[in-house]
């Protein structure tokens, strides 16, 4: 919690979020930030849309996506980007409704802290 508070709610937030509430209870959220592409400039990256299980099926995910896309438009970015796991068929079907492009060309590369340290030690 401390890391989230520091990184998202300080003077220079690393991310922003949209919260969905139902009678004062958090029902879901989207978390996003700006990234920069050498080809496309400023892009809003949607890290997550999460809807708590008991609130699913009530268009909360739709509301969160639309609100996040409106934030992207307001920020004047050149587009949005996000990832979805290839096995997450419900999410894939959800995103298809919004005419997004599914890009099979890129392969994601990741390093956790341990891998990062090991890579730097090898130099």
List PLM regions with ranges.
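Active-site rim helix/loop that mediates acceptor-substrate recognition in acyltransferases
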Residues: 1-15
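Conserved beta-strand in the GNAT
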Residues: 19, 25-33, 50
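Conserved acetyl-CoA binding element of GNAT-fold acetyltransferases
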Residues: 42-53
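Conserved acetyl-CoA-binding loop-helix of GNAT-fold acetyltransferases
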Residues: 51, 57-70, 93-97
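Conserved GNAT acetyl-CoA-binding A-motif
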Residues: 72-84
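Conserved acetyl-CoA-binding loop of GNAT-fold acetyltransferases
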Residues: 77, 96-105
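Conserved beta-strand-loop-alpha-helix junction that forms the acyl-donor binding cleft
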Residues: 82-91, 110-114
């Amino acid at each position: 919690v401390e890391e989230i508070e520091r990184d998202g709610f300080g003077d220079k937030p690393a991310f922003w979020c949209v919260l969905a509430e139902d009678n004062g209870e958090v029902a879901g959220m989207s978390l996003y930030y700006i990234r920069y592409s050498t080809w496309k400039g400023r892009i809003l990256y949607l890290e997550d849309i999460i809807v708590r299980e008991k609130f699913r099926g009530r268009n909360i995910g739709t509301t969160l996506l639309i609100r996040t896309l409106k934030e992207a438009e307001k920020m004047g970015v050149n587009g949005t980007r996000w990832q979805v796991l290839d096995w997450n068929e419900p999410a894939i079907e959800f995103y298809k409704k919004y005419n997004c492009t599914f890009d099979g060309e890129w392969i994601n590369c990741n390093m956790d802290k341990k891998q990062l340290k090991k890579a730097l030690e090898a130099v």
